From Swiss-Prot:
Species whose genome carries this gene: Bos taurus
Ranges for region Disordered: 1027-1048
GO molecular function, one term: virus receptor activity
Binding site for Ca(2+) 2: D314, N316, D318, Y320, D322
Protein known as: Integrin alpha-V
Length: 1048
């Protein structure tokens, strides 16, 4: 925001930033203001019409007007640009606005081309107030200069019109000039009248912008006026004086209001000082007799502009004036903890002791400038308490502006607005600023209710909202008898031979209100039986005359007259037609006013008092077998057991809850078993294959994000009832943090008393079970020596130079149901025996979440690995690339001899350690170890003609589970994989005889001939085509424009 400079630094025109400091702020329903057809007024475009507003009620005239300031309007004053106007607007349907002539002259001069004053851009009409025949309008940016100085100073000036007299009032146009005096006073920035016909004027620029309040008597202003005297002294003037430099830049007089705050019956002066106390802001209250200080209020937040607006009215009806203070830049923390500008109004309630109790009212929108204007409304709804309007001129949709109406009450201000007025004009070059100026507390249409004017200077508009007369209705409804006996059927049902149980419904209306209301008021009344039953449900009671649950009636009521009543007969349906006997039958009465017939001559319609409900209801009860008091008090109990004491994580655990429900008291109506089930469980159904268990009707539903199974226990569930039922669930999807699953069970009924059983919680513990196994296989599992065509090579380079491939495969598999997150696999491999190599490891591979390391170098001789390794890895049976040297058992003649077992207890072993990651149910991790049988070792003479069993061993242990809060048992196991090496003799292969081959060929040809003959006899080779019509044959010919056109 822009503010005036300190000390003698000059700006031209001086004082303009101070006036615009408020202007440049960024751009429900008292329920009885008429928002349907408000009176709208418009002024010259760009004139800021609506910057200030007031009512004008001249005592000598029956007509009443609106006063609207347009401070940037052009006038007929010679040589003046945008001098500003105040317009008087007729509130009637004509809605014409005419400028009031306060000053028709141009600038006055000391001499030719030596001006004394400067009226262009003076903002006349920036403030306007009236009292009876008197109108005070000011131009706070009016400039003048003394004959001694050439500099212009914004002292401000006002014009006071009293009846037919119009005088100028410029108390700051004095010899006390310059910034340290009244040279920058901007007199008339804020104004008001007191009850004793004094004028109160604020000049926030006096004394280095300390600010000043000045008050003079209207009679003295008029009597002492002399157009030839520029600086007039008033004998009865009250004014604040200059203070210490610490009070500079405080802006006393920025806003003003009046009210009695010391009980002497004389209006005292209230002024906002928004930059006082190091920009905390203050509000001063001065004695209206001598300008002495009565009370001060200080803001709580720097730069909130506390005191931007002030108002005084008795809001709580205790006959003491209360103070309203606006701080439109106040910031509060939002739900995210961040500061945001919402604005605030402080309401200080005056007590009999003279102290004040302050309550805070924060704005509802960010950057709306809540509290920019505050207007007392008088008693808007005639409830005995004054009301208030608070504006947020940059709130609402597209920043069009909002005015909130708050009602007074004995404890102060109702914090919830009863009505919200919204601007409807879009922004032009600046925001509409709907609500920047407001004035209420005047009954312009004489209907007994005060009205409200709202200005929107950004779109050059002013709006008059008239208050609608309030009608208070007293409605009565009586039902008798209130206890309905279904067995007592005494009323004939029209059109039948049946008799029904009936009861009487008596409904009454009385209406009254203050102000201009018609003597007769038309209402429409609607009655509805069994109101609380949902739409489409069977209503248990009907009216006898129309056999319907509803009845409509038009009633004409005399305003202020006696209660007017009518009576109807209603009856109960037969008990076979409905279930619910326990819930009360609600009889509901609602009424509406016929607003069109109640409107006044101007079309203004009254409104029903919103604080009086527009409906009334009564209840009737069906007589029950529940003792003399007709109140059933059941005693409901539930217990539960299950067929499973433990549930394993990861498994689809079937679980059956055996529930026992019983009632040891009086009947329970619409009784239901409610089972709240955990997220890990799904409802399967009711156990129906047991004679001992009741076959309940159950359904799954979600209630307030709680998953429930609801089972019907009867209506009523009679005294002494015991039910045993089985409910089947599937429990799965347990989380890693769960330790149990919990079911909550309760019996609920619709009874009024003792309607539910205690909640019973049943827990089933969770457990971990992981069936982990390790399996191994050798591929091949036998190798037979000697190997044909194998020759020793001193420096082997390929696999064939060493010997046949031997692959051991180990699979670690989790059969579940639970998962584990970490395990260790230890492999021991028979590597050497007596310094002779046994199984030479070429490489190892893994499949699955596993990482391995070995304690020796793998393939240190860098023997080239065959390309067939991939296929062999996936072949768990064997599969060396060259099977010519492998001989199966049935092909061999074994040499019986000693079998030497070479495992890690005898041979030197290489160790491979693997860390296995998470394995869920059904998952596995596989280790493939590819090696070569070191044939040289077994071809040594001392090792021949022996059988060898080469054994590798693998063991595992699970070391970690993902379940943090459950006890875990150790899981471990081991296995061995054996490769047998055996010496044997390979028999010579026997060739297939030629005659066998010839016979096989002939047999095949004979079979083919037989098949062809059979198919021929069945007509398989005969082709049958359907006849084609001529048109179809023509379509096969090329078209004229087709590719086959012969002319092309």
């Amino acid at each position: 925001m822009a503010f005036p400079p300190r000390r003698r630094l000059r700006l031209g025109p001086r004082g303009l930033p101070l006036l615009l400091s408020g202007l440049l702020l960024p751009l429900c329903r008292a329920f009885n203001l008429d928002v349907e057809s408000p009176a709208e007024y418009s002024g010259p475009e760009g004139s800021y019409f609506g910057f200030a507003v007031d009512f004008f009620v001249p005592s000598a005239s029956s007509r009443m007007f609106l006063l609207v300031g347009a401070p940037k309007a052009n006038t007929t004053q010679p040589g003046i640009v945008e001098g500003g106007q105040v317009l008087k607007c007729d509130w009637s349907s004509h809605r014409r606005c005419q400028p009031i002539e306060f000053d028709a002259t141009g600038n006055r001069d000391y001499a030719k081309d030596d001006p004394l004053e400067f009226k262009s851009h003076q903002w006349f009409g920036a403030s306007v107030r009236s009292k009876q025949d008197k109108i005070l309008a000011c131009a706070p940016l009016y400039h003048w200069r003394t004959e001694m100085k050439q500099e212009r100073e914004p002292v401000g000036t006002c014009f006071l019109q009293d009846g037919t007299k119009t005088v100028e009032y410029a108390p700051c146009r004095s010899k006390n000039i310059d910034a340290d005096g009244q040279g920058f006073c901007q007199g008339g920035f804020s104004i008001d009248f007191t009850k004793a016909d004094r004028v109160l004027l604020g000049g926030p620029g006096s004394f280095y912008w300390q600010g000043q309040l000045i008050s003079d008597q209207v009679a003295e202003i008029v009597s002492k006026y002399d157009p030839k005297v520029y600086s007039i002294k008033y004998n009865n003037q009250l004014a604040t004086r200059t203070a210490q430099a610490i009070f500079d830049d405080s802006y006393l007089g920025y806003s003003v209001a009046v009210g009695d705050f010391n009980g002497d019956g004389i209006d005292d002066f209230v002024s906002g000082v928004p930059r006082a106390a190091r920009t905390l802001g203050m509000v001063y209250i001065y004695d209206g007799k001598n300008m002495s200080s009565l009370h001060n209020f200080t803001g709580e937040q720097m730069a909130a502009y506390f005191g931007f607006s002030v108002a005084a009215t008795d809001i709580n009806g205790d006959d003491y004036a209360d103070v309203f203070i606006g701080a439109p830049l106040f910031m509060d923390r939002g739900s995210d903890g961040k500061l945001q500008e919402v604005g605030q109004v402080s309401v200080s309630l005056q007590k009999a002791s003279g102290d004040f109790q302050t309550i805070k009212l924060n704005g509802f929108e960010v950057f709306a400038r809540f509290g920019s204007a505050i207007a007392p409304l008088g008693d808007l709804d005639q409830d005995g308490f004054n009301d208030i309007a608070i504006a947020a001129p940059y709130g609402g949709e597209d920043k069009k502006g909002i005015v909130y109406i708050f009602n007074g009450r004995p404890t102060g201000l109702n914090a919830v607005p009863s009505q919200i007025l919204e601007g409807k004009w879009a922004a032009r070059s600046m925001p509409p600023s709907f609500g920047y100026s407001m004035k209420g507390a005047t009954d312009i249409d004489k209907n007994g209710y005060p009205d409200l004017i709202v200005g929107a200077f950004g779109v050059d508009r002013a709006v008059l909202y008239r208050a609608r007369p309030v009608i208070t209705v007293n409605a009565g409804l009586e039902v008798y008898p209130s206890i309905l006996n279904q067995e007592n059927k005494t009323c004939p049902l029209p059109g039948t031979d049946l008799k029904v149980s009936c009861f009487n419904v008596r409904f009454c209306l009385k209406a009254d209100g203050k102000g201009a209301l018609p003597t007769k008021l038309d209402f429409q009344v609607e009655l509805l039986l069994d109101k609380l039953k949902q739409k489409g449900a069977i209503r248990r009671a009907l009216f006898l005359h129309n056999r319907s649950p509803g009845h409509s009636k038009n009633m004409t009521i005399s305003r202020g007259g006696q209660m007017q009543c009518e009576e109807l007969i209603a009856y109960l349906r037969d008990e076979s037609e409905f279930r619910d006997k326990l819930t009360p039958i609600t009889i509901f009465m609602e009424y509406w006013l016929d607003y069109r017939t109640a409107a006044d001559a101007t079309g203004l319609q009254p409104i029903l008092n919103q604080f009086t409900p527009a409906n009334v209801s009564r209840q009737a009860h069906i007589l029950l077998d529940c003792g003399e008091d007709n109140v059933c008090k059941p005693k409901l109990e539930v217990s539960v057991d299950s067929d499973q004491k433990k549930i394993y994580i990861g498994d689809d655990n079937p679980l059956t809850l055996i529930v026992k429900a019983q009632n040891q008291g009086e009947g329970a109506y619409e009784a239901e078993l409610i089972v709240s089930i955990p997220l890990q469980a799904d409802f399967i159904g009711v156990v129906r294959n047991s004679e001992a268990l009741a076959r309940l009707s159950c359904a799954f539903k979600t209630e307030n994000q709680t998953r429930q199974v609801v089972c019907d226990l009867g209506n009523p569930m009679k005294a002494g009832t015991q039910l045993l039922a089985g409910l089947r669930f599937s429990v799965h999807q347990q989380s890693e943090m769960d330790t149990s699953v919990k079911f909550d069970l309760q019996i609920q009924s619709s009874n009024l008393f003792d309607k539910v059983s205690p909640v019973v919680s049943y827990k089933v513990d969770l457990a971990v079970l992981a069936a982990v196994e390790i399996r191994g296989v050798s591929s091949p599992d036998h190798i037979f020596l000697p190997i044909p065509n194998w020759k020793y090579k001193e420096n082997p380079e390929t696999e064939e130079d060493v010997g046949p491939v031997v692959q051991h495969i180990y699979e670690l598999r989790n059969n579940g149901p639970s998962s584990f997150s970490k395990a260790m696999l230890h492999l021991q491999w028979p590597y050497k025996y007596n310094n002779n190599t046994l199984l030479y490891i070429l490489q190892y591979d893994i499949d699955g979440p596993m990482n391995c390391t070995s304690d020796m170098e793998i393939n240190p001789l860098r023997i080239k690995i065959s390309n067939s390794q991939t296929s062999e890895k996936n072949d768990t049976v064997g599969g060396q690339g060259d099977r010519n040297h492998l001989i199966t058992k049935r092909d061999l003649t074994l040499n019986e001899g000693d079998v030497h077992t070479l495992g890690c207890g005898i041979a030197e072993c290489l160790k491979i350690v693997c860390q296995v990651g998470r394995l869920d149910r059904g998952k596995s991790a596989i280790l493939y170890v590819r090696s070569l049988l070191w044939t040289e070792t077994f071809m040594n003479k001392e090792n021949q003609n022996h059988s060898y069993s080469l054994k590798s061993s693998a063991s595992f242990n699970v070391i970690e589970f993902p379940y943090k809060n459950l006890p875990i048992e150790d899981i471990f196991n081991s296995t061995l994989v054996t490769t047998n090496v055996t010496w044997g003799i390979q028999p010579a292969p026997m060739p297939v005889p030629v005659w066998v081959i010839i016979l096989a060929v002939l047999a095949g040809l004979l079979l083919l001939a037989v098949l062809v003959f059979v198919m021929y006899r069945m007509g398989f080779f005969k082709r049958v085509r359907p006849p084609q019509e001529e048109q179809e044959r023509e379509q096969l010919q090329p078209h004229e424009n087709g590719e086959g056109n012969s002319e092309t």
